[in-house]
Amino acid sequence: MAEFMGELRRTAYCGTLRKEDVGKEVVVMGWTQRRRNLGALLFVDLRDKTGLVQVVFDDTTDSEVFDKAQAIRSEYVLAVKGKVRERESKTNKIATGDIEILADELKILSEADTTPFEILDDTNVNETLRLKYRYLDLRRPSLQKNLFVRNEITKAARKFFDENGFTEIETPMLGRSTPEGARDYLVPSRVHEGCFYALPQSPQLYKQLLMIAGFDRYYQITKCFRDEDLRANRQPEFTQIDVEMSFVEEIEDVMYPIEGLIKGIFKSTIGLDLGEGHFRTMTYKEAMENYGSDKPDTRFGLKIVNCSDLFMASAFKVFTDALAIEIGPIRGSVRAINAKNLADKFSRKELDATVEFAKTMGAKGLCWMTWQKGGEIKSSFAKFLTPEDIENIKARMDFCEGDVLFFAADKDYVVFNTLGGLRLMIAEKHGLIDKDKYDVLWVTEFPMFEWSEEENRYMAVHHPFTAPMTEDLELCETDPSKARAKAYDLVINGQESGGGSIRIHSRDIQKKMFNILGFSEEDIEKKFGFFVNAFNYGTPPHGGLAFGLDRLTMLLTKDESIRDVIAFPKVQTASCLMSDAPAPVEQKQLDELYIEVKGE
């Protein structure tokens, strides 16, 4: 039966006690990790958020207390009063391995049923069961550590913002739906029949309005929501560290101060000094052409090389057809990567599997060329190659004995996606990535627009409030495919950790941007009227960015799953296995909201 604490009050945390505390009388409280009964001697490992400490009940313990201790089982919640003493059999497996507590008072604050799985870091239990009992899963030290790191990140962020003149301001959770990009989560209004709020995908408009209002430097750590198909490391609700600054006009005006934030976070959470200089910068064009991604992982080589000019007159129709592609601004190319010294890892079976992998990345196929050490050059398109072609490939690709080449030929974006994915797969599979390294860089000069083959029009790469580079302003109208944005992404180890832009602060340019994107005057007024109207009353140059707190925590803890750095995450069906959300509601609630649920 559960007891009350009575006069006992905690004086120490379990995992903080050390040899220097020997002789002290302490009160500790926590959960029973395990219990070992040796008859006249009883050991209990007591656990709280700081770690474990061994509690001992022996022949000097009051008989009533000793008898009570016999009832202790795993995950019972205890309050123990006793004296710290040096352990006879020390251990370096836990931080408190030099000491133990000889108990003289015990209260069993709560009993526990047998748990569905052991509360251990190395427990081999499927994630579905863990998420169903998430409150038990969160008792595991590794998950608690992740959330403590997350807390350290927000502490470091708030410290930086406070020291640099930023004001924390909350923006609305219930706003207007502007269905661009991902789908909104809609919230029906009971008061306004047939009308809906939308949960924010980001505080974008509000934070820009705060700059127009004169707050100069704003931040908040806020929830955002996107009703999109979930991928491995996406969540329907996620947390952003959101920033906006006034009187900034060039990308460095935002990037350079924010580097101080990132350096502070790395230093305070994992003790890593990222150095004094500015982070490396790479243009979008460089990133795509060399790494096949706008979030390049540069911890390893395997750079993409353009070989288009080598095959302009090729007899290989796959290549020449790709080079002939012209669809609006879209062009085709032939590009390759060299997996140096890995030819012996690619049997014919492995080569075929690699071709199949390329197809999952959107390619119609993949060509290869391999040169085994001491052997001859073999290729999937050998009959179309002349001796001169092979010599040109050797020179262009630094192709040597022991290497294997992979060629992709298609529209540029297909080639980039294919070879970008392939280089990551090869690097991961063959141990080319230094997992202890943090590679931090900015990617800049993104395109303002991208051509949609489906809609046969230009779409905004980021959002319609991003400013074009000053020298590209005219290109927005004359040749949108060449216009570059004052946009920037922070990439850490091949993960987009944050991104932002300098914003448009001119009313005329903002309207022009809407027009280029195909918005009618009616659309502009309906979706953004309140925002555009604010531009009539004096708008400072401004810009900002947002960091994904979940993603940043995952990178710093080196976890593979974003679910392991969120207290109560959703699974890939956007549902919570613990609470069974989402769930049907009563008809009365639907009636109050004027909602009718249609059957399939």
Task: List each model region and its residues.
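Class II aminoacyl-tRNA synthetase catalytic cores and aaRS-like
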Residues: 1-600
